[in-house]
Amino acid sequence: MYPFIRMAKELFVNRSAQNLSVGDIHESFHICWPWDLDFWFELNNGRALTLYDLGRIPFSGKSGFSRVIFKNRWSMTMAGANVRYRKRIRAFDRIKMQTRTVCWDNRFLYIEQCMWNSKNECAGHIVYRAAFVGKDGIIDPQRIFDEIELKHQSPKMPNWLRGWVDSEKKRPWPPMQE
């Protein structure tokens, strides 16, 4: 089940938080509860993706994305993700989550998030390719930033991210049709 109560807590805690600019990091703090575990008594991979929502959605509010989305009746959807799991997170571990905008192109906003365990080790990292969507399809992220009144151009896409973006262009769709 989706952690609605935890999300409500994050939205409440961040309701009057300082606005973020491009590249600023949103930090949030969480606990891995027993219902977040898999059969090996560590954070379930699928649940980790859900927990990343707890950082990403308040981040969207602090970045001004949510205001523009609601005003225009648009939505923000995850169009792709690349995940790394490196350290185990177990029951009752405290997690520090960090979220930031990396860059954008004419179709997607690239957001990265990481989870840090109580030993200050990076336990996981995810990069999202997010699309803003209106009734006519995908909206250029630059339009969002213009409406937020942030006169930013996208930072240069890092090489490590460029590799993933380029590989997605070569990936067959629909899959498993060869």
Give the ranges of each region predicted by the language model.
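A conserved, well-ordered hydrophobic junction motif at loop->secondary-structure transitions
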Residues: 40-51
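Short coil/loop residues immediately preceding or within conserved phosphate-binding loops
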Residues: 27, 78-80, 110
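Hydrophobic beta-strand-centered segment that forms part of the acyl-chain substrate-binding groove
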Residues: 59-103, 125-130
